[in-house]
Amino acid sequence: MTLTTVLLVAAVAWLSFANGANDNFKGVATLFGTATTTYTQAIWWAMVTTLAGALFAFYLGDALIKAFSGKGLVGPEVLADPSFIAAVAIAAASTVFLATRLGFPVSTTHAIVGGLVGAGLMAPGQVAFSLLGERFLLPLLIAPFAAIALTLALYTVFRRIRLWLGVSRETCLCIGEKEHVVAVESPVMMVAQGTGSEMVLKSATGHAELRPGIELRVGDEASCKQRYNGHLIGINADSLVNVLHFISAGSVGFARGLQDTAKIVGLLVGASLIGLTDRSSLLWGVAIVAVLTALGGLLSARRVAETLGHKITDMNQGQGFTANLVTSTLVISSALWGWGVSTTHCSVGALFGVGVASGTARWAMIAQIVMAWLITLPVAALLAVAAYLIIS
């Protein structure tokens, strides 16, 4: 095994870890954001479901693995050079890792495509730009808008169904103690100061005290959660929505594992380190990528989790369920068709849709995230150019 091949394997391992750190929480962000679970509970659920989806990539991900191997995008003589795939993996991993440290949810798919373009431009031969647009860029552009539109539509439908069934939404009133500084009037007292002939009398008419009082708050305190009041098919509506919300979050984790594992394994296939026809080596590749992705999520997802759960929009569990349903549907269906959509664009786009529908979108943060999306591909491309020149 050459030094370049060792570097390639290390870069793919780093990309797997960075992908988990940035992407694993995207399915369970709604659980965390609605206080349905704690951060720890959410990240473990994300790990379990992502691992399950990653292992299914062995059975269902052949189309995506082939698409992201680079075959057809660049010539076979380029793919035969391990420097090419190593540069792609280094660029994608660096881009995603930097975004994770800054707390921005970005697209690993964008980063990989940027790496393929940058390294492809420097390598001998030509990049098939028509295939690049059809296979990669078009799905990436459509996905966030599709997620927003579907979320708005489903939110409206589900809300009308809820009202038709007589299920109301309750917001609690928080009542708690709070100490206040108050001025207390007291009887006039004559206070002697000084000694002997210098003694004078001064009056004291009051003092300040801390006294407990009652404070009332309505709305978004941690102890106040919106709940659904009523029954659906004989089941408590709030309990049913919570269960469906939890399952939908798991479905996004599964879909993400299926999509992104196949994309990363595709780099190993492109470098001919493993093959689609050699199912034994392919299984090992899928398993290693899956484990490293899970570790990345467990160890380094906190900053992205705060952004996704608390900084994009306020939401309740019903809205979280809607966002997750849209995300998982888009990601799983596109994976089966071999379209490389971004789980990030789908999940965050769905959260944008929730914010627009409920009127609680935080536009300053949304603008920052969109800007991070726009620069992901060119940054990865530039890093791939530099990495390819250094390695080769």
What are these regions (language model features)?
Residues 21-28, 36, 102-114, 259-267, ...:
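Short, non-helical or kinked segments that cap or interrupt transmembrane helices
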Residues 8-15, 45-53, 57, 61, ...:
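Alpha-helical transmembrane segments in multi-pass membrane proteins
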Residues 159-248:
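Intrinsically disordered, low-complexity non-transmembrane regions of multi-pass membrane transporters
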Residues 248-323:
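Transmembrane helical segments that form the transport core of multi-pass membrane transport proteins
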Residues 101-104, 309-343, 359, 369-373:
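Hydrophobic alpha-helical bundle architecture
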Residues 30-39, 113-127, 267-278, 348-360:
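Interfacial segments of multi-pass membrane proteins
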Residues 1-6, 74-80, 122-135, 270-284, ...:
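Helix-coil boundary and interhelical linker segments in multi-pass alpha-helical membrane proteins
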Residues 35-48, 135, 278-283, 317-322, ...:
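Membrane-interface alpha-helices at helix entry/exit sites of multi-pass transporters
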